[in-house]
A protein has these predicted regions:
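Low-complexity, acidic/polar, glycine-enriched regions of mature
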Residues: 20-181
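Bacterial Sec-dependent N-terminal signal peptides
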Residues: 1-23
Length: 181
């Protein structure tokens, strides 16, 4: 009898812990590096792995560089080349961060919340600290998060000829969207 009660208590506790950690393999990261010279440098990766711990505010993203899709295959080839993203040597971009105003985000109550996020963004093997905001919407037990920010390519040692020629923005806009169920 005691072992049955203990098993039930442990099962309930593990469900509660599991419910605090949300994951997805279909988050999206899009970037727009268009300039007045070239409107083509836009890409999207719809297979980003993301995790959110609603108890601690910990949030992580991992994106395979080769999974960014461009409208023009030639641009995708340049993007992955050694003189640009060098995706053979740096196959992933990652973000490890925290919601710093977690007390203002109620994951158990429907609504839209503004989250302050800080963390480390690693691209091209270079880690930089970033701060941004995210819009978090809770509805029907689903958590949707969206964030938009810019990065400086030179901060990540991305200096392809397209950047110096003005064909690619030196500060592309990054948009991250994720749905945690």
């Amino acid at each position: 009898m005691k072992s049955t009660i203990l098993s039930v208590v442990l099962a309930i506790a593990s469900i509660a812990v599991f419910a605090q950690k949300k994951t997805t393999t279909s988050a999206t990261i899009a970037f727009d590096a268009t300039t007045s010279i070239d409107a083509l440098p836009k890409a999207e990766n719809k297979t980003v792995v993301a995790a959110l711990d609603t108890k601690t505010g910990s949030i992580q993203f991992e994106a395979a560089i080769k999974s960014f899709a461009f409208s023009n295959p030639r641009i995708q080839q340049h993007f992955n080349a050694a003189n640009w993203m060098d995706s053979d040597n740096f196959p992933k971009a990652t973000f490890n961060g925290t919601i710093t105003n977690l007390a203002k985000v109620n994951f158990s109550k429907e609504g839209t919340y503004t989250a302050d996020v800080e963390g480390a963004l690693t691209i091209h093997g270079v880690e930089q600290k970033i701060k941004t905001t995210a819009a978090i919407t809770v509805k029907g037990g689903v958590i949707n998060a969206t964030s938009e920010f810019s990065i400086k390519l030179e901060d990540y040692k991305v200096n392809g000829a397209q950047v110096t020629s003005g064909k690619v923005s030196k500060e592309p806009k990054i948009t991250v969207t994720s749905e945690f169920k």
